[in-house]
UniProtKB/Swiss-Prot annotation:
This is Probable aspartoacylase. Its EC number is 3.5.1.15. It catalyses: an N-acyl-L-aspartate + H2O = a carboxylate + L-aspartate. Gene3D superfamilies: 2.20.25.160, Zn peptidases. Keywords: Hydrolase, Metal-binding, Zinc. Belongs to the AspA/AstE family. Aspartoacylase subfamily. It is an enzyme of class 3 (hydrolase). Its cofactor is Zn(2+).
């Protein structure tokens, strides 16, 4: 059985101001006090980037979800709006004694419902395995290990992101809101039950571990010169030699890796400026 010491949660929306789903979910849960259904848990709500939310923009000066490394928060010369917000949020989360963070996001990529985990902590893996069994659409993603995560969910060890897509930027999507609320409620129900050891432990969890990112082919001026091949789909296997990009002049760029990989965040609109057309993962089954 899984026994959790989680008592205090942060539910975060609006880290990216044009991802309206998380903003709406936080507002609804706070206004309607949905947390009363989970009395063993203390829920704290955060709308992370108020100016960007008001402007319906991803960010004001820079991506807030790249501002949470400890060394950046301690740097007195970093004074952009999001850098200041990162310090404020880190302070508030620390004062509240938060021991679990759920960060709500959407993506323009057709990824369905994805859980992005901080680390392979047994509680996170058991939770992810439980949720995957509840909803076959759910996939579990882990980024490459980093000592100091730049994401808000990295402010405590037990953190995860709910990432839902495809959802266009800046829109109110009732279906995405409903799916996010359902997944969030299941997370809280699991954590509530685990405080008294009332959930079974899983044997393993299937995880997609990020190993690389790929940019679009570009010319000498940095302009994109090719399109992602239409048969490339999120979480669908890419084998060596598979065409990845079709160029406007008719040539093809194939996948040149040596092993089968599984792409995610395919064509994510916000990642063009980061030089990312897609991320590549390996699918693994991790024993818990």
């Amino acid at each position: 059985m899984v026994n959790s010491a989680v008592r205090s949660l942060a539910i975060v929306g609006g880290v990216h101001g044009n991802e309206r789903t998380g903003v709406e979910v936080v507002r609804r849960w706070q206004q309607k006090d949905f947390a009363r259904y989970f009395p063993a848990l203390k829920c704290h709500y955060f709308l992370a980037n108020p100016r960007a939310i008001a402007a319906n923009r991803r960010y004001i000066n820079q991506d807030l979800n790249r501002c949470f490394r400890p060394q950046d928060r301690k740097n007195p010369y970093l004074m952009g709006y999001e850098q200041l917000r990162a310090r404020q949020l880190a302070h508030q989360i620390s004062l509240a004694g938060i021991d679990f963070i759920v960060d709500l996001h959407t993506t323009t990529a057709a990824m369905g419902t994805t859980l992005i985990l901080n680390c392979p902590h047994p509680l996170l893996l058991n939770l992810a395995a439980y949720l995957s069994a509840q909803d076959e659409e759910i996939r579990v993603l882990q980024y490459s290990p980093q000592k100091d995560l730049p994401y808000i969910r990295g402010l405590c060890e037990l953190g995860l992101t709910i990432e839902l897509g495809p959802v266009p930027q800046g829109v109110y999507d009732p279906t995405a809101i409903a799916k996010t609320q359902r997944t969030l409620a299941r997370i809280l129900a699991y954590l509530q039950a685990s405080t008294s050891g009332n959930v079974p432990a899983a044997d393993n969890c299937t995880v997609y571990q990020q190993i690389d990112t790929i940019d679009y082919p570009r010319d000498e001026q940095g302009q994109i010169v090719a399109e992602i091949a239409p048969h490339i789909r999120d979480y669908q296997a890419i084998k060596p030699g598979t065409p990845l990009f079709y160029h406007r002049r008719g040539n093809v760029t194939p996948y040149q890796g040596a092993a089968t990989v599984y792409p995610v965040f395919i064509g994510e609109a916000a990642y063009v400026e980061k030089g990312i057309a897609m991320a590549l993962t390996q699918r693994k089954t991790i024993a818990i």
